[in-house]
Amino acid sequence: MRIGIISRTDKEEAIELDDTIIKYLFENNIEVELDSQLTKKLPQYSENSVDITKMNADIVLCVGGDGTVLHAQRYLSPKKIPILSINMGTVGFLTEVDPEDIFECLDKLLSYDFFIEERLQLDVLIDSQWHTVLNELVLMTSQPAKMLDLRVSVDEEIVDEVRADGLIISTPSGSTAYAMSAGGPIVDPRVDAAIIIPICPFKLNTRPKIVPADSIITVKFLKEGKKGVAVLDGIVNKEFDYLGEIKLKKSENSAYFVRFKKNFYNSVNNKLIVG
């Protein structure tokens, strides 16, 4: 088994945990690939340094919060490389393991006592370029105190004309992120669906909607003189303006996660209490 490690590098506790994990893997004769950003913090392992775009591990340990997972997934999901996420963030809805449980879980990993969970992603077309999101696309105004006027269609049928502070189009994985804070439902990741959630809509009858994942969702911008920003998984920002159009569809590339037990609802409930 070859194991990769991608980590947040702005937190000393994460770097210390990385060092401990690396030593454990070496002691167990495991081949290790380390993200080149990590080896800048741990130069003693520079011989194991690999650019994230060239990682070819069987499984990648992702040490950080949901942001670290989303960053890693952009490069790993096209290669179908599963992630084992270790929570060194705040709440961590995408993470599987707490630091105090890491060695128990590594023992299970090396014994192949785990399963792989597949999660839906969405492809987003903006300015003739396709992007993939695991959590969500967020559309928001770039002008403070202004609202967006949007037309939302599903398979060419107009669903709503939305006047709101913004709009979220989420996967089930993203339903516990910004979408939940905006009043959207928590959706089991086994559900093959996309969720459309307006942010502070002007009309009271503009409500969240769940649509089949294999639908084509189109968002069109209706008012001249207004500009906005499209934010993809909190990482990529794209500007848009009048008559701009965004399309979303189910991605052919799923995300893959290492899991040790099926406990989605228990995990969500516990993390909501902590959050």
Curated annotation (Swiss-Prot):
Q: What molecular function does GO assign, one term? A: metal ion binding
Output the lineage of the source organism: Archaea, Methanobacteriati, Methanobacteriota, Methanomada group, Methanobacteria
Task of the protein:
Involved in the regulation of the intracellular balance of NAD and NADP, and is a key enzyme in the biosynthesis of NADP. Catalyzes specifically the phosphorylation on 2'-hydroxyl of the adenosine moiety of NAD to yield NADP.
What's the protein name? NAD kinase
Keywords, comma-separated and alphabetical: ATP-binding, Cytoplasm, Kinase, NAD, NADP, Nucleotide-binding, Transferase
Name of the encoding gene: nadK
User: Pfam families this protein is in?
Assistant: NAD_kinase (PF01513), NAD_kinase_C (PF20143)
- Which InterPro entries does this chain map to? ATP-NAD_kinase_N, ATP-NAD_kinase_PpnK-typ_C, NAD/diacylglycerol_kinase_sf, NADK
Give an example GO biological process.
NAD metabolic process
Query: Which reaction is recorded as catalysed by this protein?
Result: NAD(+) + ATP = ADP + NADP(+) + H(+)
Q: Which cofactor names does the annotation list?
A: a divalent metal cation
Q: Which family does it belong to?
A: Belongs to the NAD kinase family.
Residue positions annotated to bind NAD(+) are: 66-67, 71, 135-136, 146, 163, 165, 176-181
Report the EC code(s) recorded for this entry. 2.7.1.23
Q: Identify which residues the record assigns to the active site.
A: 66 (proton acceptor)
Q: Give the location in the cell.
A: Cytoplasm
Instruction: Please tell me whether the keyword Iron is annotated for this protein.
Output: no
UniProt keyword Transit peptide, yes or no: no
Instruction: Please name the HAMAP family in this protein's record.
Output: NAD_kinase
Q: Which GO terms describe its cellular component?
A: cytoplasm
The primary location reported for this protein is cytoplasm
